[in-house]
Amino acid sequence: MEKKYLRKHFALYLCLVILNLAFIWGNSFVPGEISGEISGGIFEVFSDLFAVFGDKGQFVLRKLAHFSEFTALGFFLTGLWRNISCREHVTAPLLLGLAAACIDETIQIFSPGRGSSLIDVWIDFSGVCLGFLLSRLLRHLLDRKAARKGPHT
């Protein structure tokens, strides 16, 4: 029963990682002009929230989008790795997330009207780290809750 449970969760996290990476990298292939139009449309919807940033509002929105997508990736990678290995590993999900951020910025070098940014790699990696921490925190809280209930009979 335990192996079946792990396989199901492994498949779920693997799908989530693949979908998340497809979304992230797919957006990196979008030419700069179209990407700007998309983020401009999203900015219009949330313009009141970003008004405090003045003319930098759209810039902040784009960086927040980077951070958010990579936070999700960090969360999913940590869950995936937990189902691959018996032990909790810190380095594997974080290094995989950093590699994904580097690949993302490399893709943008070859996308028309786009460019690569070292700052974006750091923003992306910070998101991965937050996702990792949130996943570990959730796992800790769930384990504590299960320990209070005691073993299932």
Indicate residue ranges for each PLM-predicted region.
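Short helix-capping/hinge motifs at transmembrane helix termini and TM-loop junctions
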Residues: 30-31, 82, 112, 139
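Alpha-helical transmembrane segments of integral membrane proteins
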Residues: 8-16, 88-96, 119, 123
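Interfacial helix-loop-helix junctions of multi-pass membrane proteins
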Residues: 101-125
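Membrane-interfacial alpha-helical segments at the cytosolic side of multi-pass membrane proteins
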Residues: 68-83, 126-142
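"…centered on the first transmembrane helix and the immediately adjacent amphipathic helix/loop
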Residues: 2-75
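Short, charged juxtamembrane terminal tails flanking transmembrane helices
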Residues: 146-153
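Membrane-interface helix-boundary motifs at transmembrane edges
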Residues: 3-8, 81-88
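Small-polar-interrupted transmembrane alpha-helices in polytopic inner-membrane proteins
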Residues: 17-24, 90-109
